[in-house]
């Protein structure tokens, strides 16, 4: 499988320009559209390329998926128990406390406030991640990616809960 950054003609950095990503993606989709194929073999090849382009685009477009993918390129698998255990007990405790807070909150306004807090935390974590990858500090990038994953989980839980409160 080709490196997603290479496939889309992008520099392999975390802090990518999403507008350039989108521009490259659409240009490549047009170039390799199966309907433009001259024969069946080329059509099948274009289908595979188009599928890979979709995977690459949706992976690189998302800050968490992009971080996980970059770590994977460096040989770090977040599903490894040793890697996941890099978060401190305090950080994990805070995460579970926040999950419980969300579960026990029934006011839409309160949920919105919590969501705003976590959206700010998400932005900050993405900025920290960009720095970690820039310095090639994989240990720190791994921790920051794990934190970002927990923040995404909390935001997802918040959105579910907010739908129920409407």
From Swiss-Prot:
Signal peptide: none
Keywords associated with the record: Chaperone
Any one biological process term the GO annotation gives: [2Fe-2S] cluster assembly
Superkingdom of this protein's organism: Bacteria
Domain J: from-to ranges: 3-73
One Pfam family named in its UniProt record: DnaJ
CDD domains hit by this protein: DnaJ
GO molecular function: ATPase activator activity; protein-folding chaperone binding
Transmembrane segments: none
Classification via InterPro entries: DnaJ_domain, HscB, HscB_C_sf, HscB_oligo_C, J_dom_sf
PANTHER family (alphabetical): IRON-SULFUR CLUSTER CO-CHAPERONE PROTEIN HSCB (PTHR14021:SF15)
Similarity annotation: Belongs to the HscB family.
Quaternary structure annotation from Swiss-Prot or TrEMBL: Interacts with HscA and stimulates its ATPase activity.
Biological function: Co-chaperone involved in the maturation of iron-sulfur cluster-containing proteins. Seems to help targeting proteins to be folded toward HscA.
Protein name listed in UniProt: Co-chaperone protein HscB homolog
